[in-house]
């Protein structure tokens, strides 16, 4: 289940496409404040947005929105998964640099003022006023849950309701990363593959317990 974290990012692309968020952003912010988005630094060095075609700006905008959409539910787990899977990459025609993607998500999560976050909030607010989007702005994720106590004892975590599901995924990913880097307790001496498999199994069992309880309650 933890490997499904990138699906939050992909869902962000769907929301963006269906609501026209990036298309509205390019109309209003492409030529503002040197392009608003972080100026890309590719193999040839830093270039100005004014010298680049619109499709590159739009591609970068879509990726930043999908990252922020994901962060609303699973915090920094989305971009951390990206970093661990693909490493740090410079900007390309299709994607911003990994460094800038992580920075924007971290700024959002830490309430640090960021022009990209401000841009999306302004666009979302405009669409909200038109009745096209329910939320008036990007929203911070729920606080992390204490999965450590149960996972340290190799037991499934009790998820109280659906609202906790996203926070549970986020918390479980953070727990997995911690035990990967510095195994403690029962995880000491195990390979990263064994740690990942066991924690993923615990996550799956935790989610399945919720599904079973709901099914029984509906009968």
Q: Model regions: which residues?
A:
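Non-catalytic terminal regions of proteins
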Residues: 1-4, 96-219
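Catalytic Zn2+-binding segment of zinc metalloproteases
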Residues: 10-27, 73-78
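Post-HEXXH active-site segment of zinc metalloproteases
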Residues: 17-55
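Short pre-active-site segment immediately N-terminal to the catalytic Zn-binding motif
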Residues: 1-7, 54-57
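Metalloprotease/metallohydrolase-associated module, dominated by Zn2+-dependent proteases
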Residues: 41-102
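Generic structural signal for hydrophobic core residues of well-folded globular domains
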Residues: 11, 15, 73, 85-86, ...
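Generic helix-packing signal
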Residues: 16, 70-74, 176, 210
């Amino acid at each position: 289940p933890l490997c499904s974290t990138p699906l939050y990012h992909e869902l962000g692309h769907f929301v963006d496409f269906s609501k026209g968020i990036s298309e509205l952003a390019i109309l209003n912010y492409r030529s503002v404040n040197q392009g608003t988005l972080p100026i890309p630094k590719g193999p040839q060095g830093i270039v100005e947005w004014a010298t680049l075609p619109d499709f590159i700006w739009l591609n970068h905008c879509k990726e930043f929105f999908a990252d922020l959409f994901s962060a609303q539910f699973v915090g920094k787990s989305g971009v951390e998964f990206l970093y661990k899977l693909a490493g740090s990459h410079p900007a390309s025609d299709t994607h911003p640099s990994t460094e800038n993607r992580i920075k924007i998500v971290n700024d959002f999560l830490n309430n640090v003022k960021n022009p990209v976050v401000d841009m999306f909030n302004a666009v979302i607010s405009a669409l909200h006023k038109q009745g096209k989007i329910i939320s008036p702005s990007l929203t911070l994720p729920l606080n992390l849950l204490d999965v450590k106590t149960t996972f340290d004892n190799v037991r499934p975590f009790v998820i109280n309701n659906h609202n906790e599901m996203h926070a549970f995924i986020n918390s479980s990913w953070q727990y997995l990363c911690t035990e990967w880097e510095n195994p403690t307790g029962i995880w000491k001496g195990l390979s990263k593959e064994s740690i990942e498999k066991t924690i993923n199994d615990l996550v799956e069992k935790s989610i399945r317990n919720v599904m079973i309880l709901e099914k029984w309650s509906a009968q």
